[in-house]
Amino acid sequence: MKKAVNVETNNFDTSLKEQILAVKNAGFQGVFFDWADTEEFKEIVEFTRATGLEIASIHAPFDHVCDMWNEEKPEIFHKLIKCINDCGSLNIKTLVCHVYIGFDTVAKVTDIGIKNFSLLIDEAEKYDLNLAFENTEGVECLYGIKEHLSHRKNCGFCIDTGHEFCYNAGYDLLKDFCDKLFFLHINDNMGVTGDRVFWTDDSHIIPFKHGKVNWQRFTSNLKSINWNSWISLELCVKNKPNKHTHDDLIGVPCEAFYNMAFEAAKRIEGNVND
């Protein structure tokens, strides 16, 4: 299986290009990063491909994405359309999208929301671009997408292991979404550490370190669904506010970080293949 990892502008005090080269040198075959409505985004895509790395996916913007369930074509809708157009024109194959954001509101599936997301899929189909809808808080809306839209060829899902652990306890998302699983965000965390579910627990730790995700269960589940696509890690290198999950990475250069990440990816692959 091919292996990929994310790069982010705020992960290190180095450029995205330097991080991408470190990813390549660590042994990964692919990389993924956020879309931006800039010429630099297109330049980074071209640079990545010139190194020989594949663009495993791109991450769509998700600010105010909960408005998709309450308004007809809200501002975020138009931003997502622009993102789809850019990715399609650059021959990106997979775009990861959130369907909800917010910890102080109740997720509710609505007709207008299904219509908005259906229109996004319409646009993606023009480019044969796969939309991989990701589990976050408000997982009820993800199940709404599955119920109403998963019959569409370009509608599928991205399962984030860390989100499942700290946001979606009690769900078996790989089992529920395996029929249309397009991508993975593999990462670890400490679970819910406070008195409520909150984004600061979404640590994105390298697997097999000090997080609490059950990796034996995860790799067993991957094996059971015959997963043979990307082993893709979505990681952070810095602490969330008032957290200390990444203290061990303070001062670690990006080359060493991506070497550690690649070893974790190989271990996951090995466990799946056992």
Residue ranges and their predicted role:
Residues 47-63, 114-127, 213-220:
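Alpha-helix-loop-beta-strand connector modules within alpha/beta enzyme cores
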Residues 1-4, 9, 13-24, 92, ...:
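Histidine-acidic metal/acid-base catalytic patches
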Residues 19, 44, 83, 120, ...:
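Aromatic/hydrophobic pocket-lining residues that form π-stacking "cages" and hydrophobic walls in ligand
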